[in-house]
Amino acid sequence: MDNRPVGVYDSGLGGLTVWREIRRQLPEESLVYLGDGKNCPYGARPADEICRLADEAVGRLVGAGCKMVVVACNTATAAAIDFLRRKYRQMPIVGMEPAVKPACLNTRSGVVGVLATARSLDGDLFRRTAARYGENIRVLTAVGEGFVELVEEDREQSPEAVETVRRVLEPMIREGADQIVLGCTHYPFLLPVFRQVIGERGVAVVDPSPAVGRRVGPVSYTHLRAPET
């Protein structure tokens, strides 16, 4: 077994939702977490700036001896994942994919809502995924305005959090969305608020973090298993 750590990187605290899933699913793995709190949030920054910040962060994790890196940030994945995989070809890099597929497969109403940062929603990865799985599905999108700041400032259980989530979520529910995709790793910290706002209306919230955790094990095994002797 390769005992080097797995690096997990995010713009701030959001990637801890992914870190938690990797720890739960792969307790034998050592993990190193890097949160770029100095530059958080990334959502409205230009793509080239996000790419530079992601490069610096991944470079630090490579320098720390990580065997692979999980870019636990949807915005950084959208802006930089192709560049990172080209530059750091010697190691596997796992990114965040929008959980549009399971939402589209499970919707009963034919309407899916996706909450993410502006940069993520503008990215090719989201557009390709929505086009591939969203045929005959109405995909609504909205920026989670203020969500990241609530989490970073430890206000996710405040009355302000309830009103902030309600303001963004209610229009999607009124339009018939029965699946809400959390397209930013900060957003799962607000899950109790989402459930409070949704109540008994039968709307599912899709968190992509468990799926990323499930990907890390096979990628690690495929790329990093020791050669037979």
Segment roles from a protein language model:
Residues 1-225:
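Non-catalytic structural scaffold of enzyme domains
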